[in-house]
C-alpha cells in the first residue's frame, strides 16, 4: 500500500509535504461544499423526473443556473436574529453544523494518495464529529425561544443519539474483520472481497442509522413541515439557514462516501478490474453518486412514520440486529483463528 501511495504522489509533494497537505485539504473540502450545494438542484431535477414533473427549468439551459439564483437569493436576504433569541448560541448553531459536517471529510480516503488526514482512529473521529453535530440542532432549537424549534431540537437530539448507538455498533463488524479503525486499511482489506458480503446485515443497519442521523426523509421528524413548521431552524433565514441547508447535503455525501469506503471497496474497482487510464478516484465518485441518488429516491418514494415509531424501530429492531451482527462476526473470526 505504501508503495502505491508513493507512486501516485506528485514529485513536488516530497519536497513540500505541508503545502501538499494544505492543497489536498482545500481541494477536497471545496469540492465537497460545491457538490453539496449542487445537490439541491440535482435532487429537485431527479424528484421531478421520477414524479413526471418539469422541475426547475427556467434559469439557464435546462435550469442549470437555478442553484446560482438560489445562492444569490439567500446571500442577499436580511441576516436577521430574533429579539427574543439567545444571540450568541443562535449564531453559533449553524457554524457548528457546517464545521462538523465538513471536518468529518478529513478522514475519508478518496484514492490511495488523495485524502486530507490518514488517521489511525479515522472511524472514531467520524463518530466524535457526529456526536458534536447534535449540539448544532440543540443550540438552534433552544436559542430560538420558539416552541416548535425546541420540540424539533429535542426530537433531533433523542433521534441522533439513539441511532448513533446503532451506527457505531454496525461499524464494529467491519473493524473486527479489517483489524483497524483506519479507513485506508479498511479499504485495502477489501481487495479480495467487499465487506458488503460478510457484513450485509451491518450494511443495512448502517444505512438506516445513517439516514436517521442526517435527518433525511423518512427520518426527518426533527424538521417535519406538517408538524413542526421546519422544526429547529424555523427562526433562521438568509445565510444562517443556508449553512444548515448545505450542512445537511454535506452529511448526505459523507454518509454515502462512508458506505462506499466501509462496504463497497472505496476506490477499488469491481472484481479487481484493471482498466487503463481510469484513476481510482473515478470508482469512488461513481459509487458515492449512486448512494446519493438512493437518498434522493428515498425522499420521493417513502412516507414519514410517526416519531414514536422511529424510536421503537431503533431500539427494538436495529439495536438487537446490530448486536447479533457483532456477535456472529466475532464468533466467525474466533472460529477461523482456532
UniProtKB/Swiss-Prot annotation:
Disulfide bonds: none
Keyword terms, alphabetized: Cell inner membrane, Cell membrane, Membrane, NAD, Quinone, Translocase, Transmembrane, Transmembrane helix, Ubiquinone
Subcellular location: Cell inner membrane
Main localisation: membrane
Signal peptide: none
GO MF, one annotated term: quinone binding
Any Pfam family matching the protein: NADHdh
Keyword Lipid metabolism: no
One cellular component (GO) term of this entry: plasma membrane
Membrane association type: Multi-pass membrane protein
Catalytic activity: a quinone + NADH + 5 H(+)(in) = a quinol + NAD(+) + 4 H(+)(out)
GO BP field: aerobic respiration
Enzyme Commission code(s) on record: 7.1.1.-
Top-level taxon in the UniProt lineage: Bacteria
Membrane-spanning intervals of the chain: 22-42, 96-116, 121-141, 161-181, 193-213, 249-269, 277-297, 315-335
The protein's assembly and partners: NDH-1 is composed of 14 different subunits. Subunits NuoA, H, J, K, L, M, N constitute the membrane sector of the complex.
Sequence similarity: Belongs to the complex I subunit 1 family.
Function, as annotated: NDH-1 shuttles electrons from NADH, via FMN and iron-sulfur (Fe-S) centers, to quinones in the respiratory chain. The immediate electron acceptor for the enzyme in this species is believed to be ubiquinone. Couples the redox reaction to proton translocation (for every two electrons transferred, four hydrogen ions are translocated across the cytoplasmic membrane), and thus conserves the redox energy in a proton gradient. This subunit may bind ubiquinone.
Protein name, UniProt field: NADH-quinone oxidoreductase subunit H
Species of origin: Acinetobacter baumannii (strain ATCC 17978 / DSM 105126 / CIP 53.77 / LMG 1025 / NCDC KC755 / 5377)
Name of the encoding gene: nuoH
Amino acid at each position: 500500500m505504501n508503495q502505491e501511495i508513493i507512486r501516485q504522489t506528485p514529485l513536488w509533494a516530497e519536497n513540500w509535504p505541508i503545502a501538499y497537505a494544505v492543497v489536498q485539504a482545500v481541494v477536497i473540502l471545496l469540492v465537497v461544499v460545491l457538490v453539496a450545494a449542487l445537490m439541491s438542484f440535482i435532487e429537485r431535477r431527479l424528484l421531478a423526473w421520477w414524479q413526471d414533473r418539469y422541475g426547475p427549468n427556467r434559469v439557464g439551459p435546462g435550469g442549470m443556473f437555478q442553484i446560482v439564483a438560489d445562492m444569490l437569493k439567500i446571500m442577499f436576504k436580511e441576516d436577521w436574529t430574533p429579539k427574543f433569541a439567545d444571540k450568541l448560541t443562535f449564531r453559533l448553531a449553524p457554524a457548528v453544523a457546517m464545521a462538523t459536517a465538513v471536518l468529518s471529510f478529513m478522514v475519508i480516503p478518496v484514492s490511495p494518495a488523495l485524502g486530507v488526514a490518514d488517521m489511525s482512529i479515522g472511524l472514531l473521529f467520524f463518530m466524535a464529529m457526529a456526536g458534536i453535530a447534535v449540539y448544532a440542532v440543540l443550540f438552534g432549537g433552544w436559542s430560538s425561544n420558539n416552541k416548535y424549534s425546541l420540540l424539533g431540537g429535542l426530537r433531533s437530539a433523542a433521534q441522533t443519539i439513539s441511532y448513533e448507538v446503532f451506527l457505531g455498533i454496525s461499524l464494529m463488524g467491519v473493524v473486527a474483520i479489517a483489524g483497524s479503525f483506519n479507513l485506508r486499511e479498511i479499504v485495502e482489506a477489501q481487495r479480495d472481497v467487499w465487506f458488503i458480503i460478510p457484513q450485509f446485515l451491518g450494511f443495512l443497519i448502517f444505512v438506516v442509522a445513517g439516514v436517521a442521523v442526517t435527518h433525511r426523509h423518512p427520518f426527518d421528524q426533527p424538521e417535519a413541515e406538517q408538524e413542526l413548521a421546519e422544526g429547529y431552524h424555523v427562526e433562521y433565514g438568509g445565510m444562517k439557514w443556508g449553512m444548515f441547508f448545505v450542512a445537511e447535503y454535506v452529511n448526505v455525501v459523507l454518509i454515502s462516501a462512508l458506505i462506499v469506503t466501509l462496504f463497497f471497496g472505496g476506490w477499488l474497482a469491481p472484481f479487481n478490474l484493471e482498466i487503463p487510464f481510469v484513476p481510482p478516484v473515478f470508482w469512488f465518485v461513481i459509487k458515492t453518486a449512486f448512494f446519493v441518488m438512493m437518498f434522493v429516491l428515498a425522499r420521493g418514494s417513502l412516507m414519514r412514520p410517526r416519531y414514536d415509531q422511529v424510536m421503537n424501530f431503533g431500539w427494538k429492531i436495529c439495536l438487537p440486529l446490530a448486536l447479533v451482527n457483532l456477535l456472529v462476526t466475532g464468533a466467525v473470526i474466533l472460529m477461523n483463528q482456532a
